[in-house]
Amino acid sequence: MSPECAQTTGPGPSHTLDQVNRTHFPFFSDVKGDHRLVLSVVETTVLGLIFVVSLLGNVCALVLVARRRRRGATASLVLNLFCADLLFTSAIPLVLVVRWTEAWLLGPVVCHLLFYVMTMSGSVTILTLAAVSLERMVCIVRLRRGLSGPGRRTQAALLAFIWGYSALAALPLCILFRVVPQRLPGGDQEIPICTLDWPNRIGEISWDVFFVTLNFLVPGLVIVISYSKILQITKASRKRLTLSLAYSESHQIRVSQQDYRLFRTLFLLMVSFFIMWSPIIITILLILIQNFRQDLVIWPSLFFWVVAFTFANSALNPILYNMSLFRNEWRKIFCCFFFPEKGAIFTDTSVRRNDLSVISS
């Protein structure tokens, strides 16, 4: 008996035959049939629009936040959020290439890195939102006790932890994504696809449960608890906080309004994240279940549109943030571009008001 026959029929590991006959999920590879051109144009238009809006929005938001004279922990975390969004949407051109070619022609290196970078940046986003909510709660407690905020070293350590943990948590995807030949439904021959190839089901289940719990459910719980605590503190001690601040009455009102506006903006960012990331988390879990139930069918086109919906969150974040906190800056840019004379007047009257923003606390 040849070694090959012995490998498939002998008393070897039980998962060897399963791996040979296993059908892998093709992710972005798909055979679209007769409507390939129309579908590809629609997909390109949608993702192209998301990419442009995300790129312009996040870059503008980065510039507006970075130009602040004083930047505290919240500002650093918000900058980190925009950087993660830019990294996440950087995968869009590669996704579009695969949607046009159908087969994976980008090579094994890109296959290893594409889903790794997307997963890592998504993890950075949710952890950053959790850190922002926690920092806001701590900031209010410190304000009541007259304590200063975290220093630059603490902020740098927090950002390093977020990126380091996210990189390690997503590392199995970098290792286990590989290019394999497979015949897709609607195709007449095998084509190369980039897919996730776990050595065994136990490892796949363990990682899925670990990642969803620690990178989605736990940060979500932290966000809910933090914002609930913020609301509780705000309602219970709003009058006492206003009376105890060592500022003029008008300045107290301004800071309170800005703090409420920042809280509302960050809350909207959190809500939009969970709404727009929950479908992809559910889809990934369904792909795992598909390994055990062959009657459960998940089409690559469905996966693509779920990912496109998730990409849209990176375009929505800077829009929500800019519209809520940088209305004056955008009015100034608009006036300076179209009405230079009014823009100069608006600039002079808005400098002091901009410097009072709570984001620098």
UniProtKB/Swiss-Prot annotation:
It is a multi-pass membrane protein. GO terms for cellular component: ciliary basal body; ciliary membrane; cilium; endocytic vesicle; endosome membrane; lysosomal membrane; plasma membrane. Glycans are attached at residue 21. Belongs to the G-protein coupled receptor 1 family. The modification Phosphoserine is found at residues 350, 357, 360-361. It is found in: Cell membrane; Endosome membrane; Lysosome membrane; Cell projection, Cilium membrane. Phosphorylated at two clusters of Ser and Thr residues located in the intracellular C-terminus, a prerequisite for FFAR4 internalization via an ARRB2-dependent pathway. Its main location: membrane. GO terms for biological process: adenylate cyclase-activating G protein-coupled receptor signaling pathway; brown fat cell differentiation; fat cell differentiation; G protein-coupled receptor signaling pathway; ghrelin secretion; hormone secretion; inflammatory response; negative regulation of apoptotic process. The keyword Glycoprotein applies. The gene is Ffar4. Highly expressed in brown and white adipose tissue. Expressed in perivascular ciliated preadipocytes (at protein level). Expressed in the taste buds of the circumvallate and fungiform papillae, mainly in type II cells (at protein level). Abundant expression is detected in the gastrointestinal tract. Highly expressed in lung and pituitary gland. Expressed in enteroendocrine K cells of the upper small intestine. Expressed in alpha and delta cells of pancreatic islets. Expressed in pro-inflammatory CD11C-positive macrophages. Also expressed in spleen. Disruption phenotype: Deficient mice show glucose intolerance, hyperinsulinemia and display insulin (INS) resistance and a reduced preference for fatty acids. When fed a high-fat diet, they develop obesity and have fatty liver with decreased adipocyte differentiation and lipogenesis, and enhanced hepatic lipogenesis. INS resistance in such mice is associated with reduced INS signaling and enhanced inflammation in adipose tissue. This is Free fatty acid receptor 4. G-protein-coupled receptor for long-chain fatty acids (LCFAs) with a major role in adipogenesis, energy metabolism and inflammation. Signals via G-protein and beta-arrestin pathways. LCFAs sensing initiates activation of phosphoinositidase C-linked G proteins GNAQ and GNA11 (G(q)/G(11)), inducing a variety of cellular responses via second messenger pathways such as intracellular calcium mobilization, modulation of cyclic adenosine monophosphate (cAMP) production, and mitogen-activated protein kinases (MAPKs). Residues 1-45, 99-103, 178-204, 290-295 are extracellular. Induction: Up-regulated in response to high-fat diet in adipose tissue macrophages and in hepatic Kupffer cells. Up-regulated in response to either short- or long-term cold exposure in brown adipose tissue and inguinal white adipose tissue. Up-regulated by ADRB3 agonist. The modification Phosphothreonine is found at residues 347, 349.
